[in-house]
């Protein structure tokens, strides 16, 4: 990604690439996308009227990166200050919402958006949280819209974070046969492996991770695939 903007002196001197790339499916192809960010407070101060001019799109198969210049620059971003800060902008609009994160994506036409899942407490005893909706923010205009989980547009790829998916499966794997069994005996208790990956199927991003026994985690006993937009999970035995 850095190479893609390296030849653009006016860009590389004022902005840096957000290293937290988002895995997306763009017209059926696996891609990674990241916005540019201001390289510090003074870079923001000097460029705040111009905004952020574009983003970087990486082909995950060919390992080729392209810089995409926008017709309308990005105003609201994580590296912005004061009223240009994305989190501050969302807090003003949704003061009671609990945001899980802010994920940069583009739709099928290449228009940029931040996907911002909202959370609610589901398990009081354990302090568990789960996604209950999504706010989609246009970072160029600041326009935001809140969606319930069954209303999320098809082009959105990431509503459920991989870490949250692993946590949710571990709740299921440990507690399916009861809380007492999860502490004493741990019969049939399962947990996910320490890492996860992404796969694009039918223009959706799926998160996959291995599953092991709590008692013996030396080998996988199966794996689980979860749709990162809908949360639909499928378990496969090995």
Label each residue range with its predicted role:
Residues 1-238:
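Soluble extracytoplasmic regions of secretory-pathway and membrane proteins
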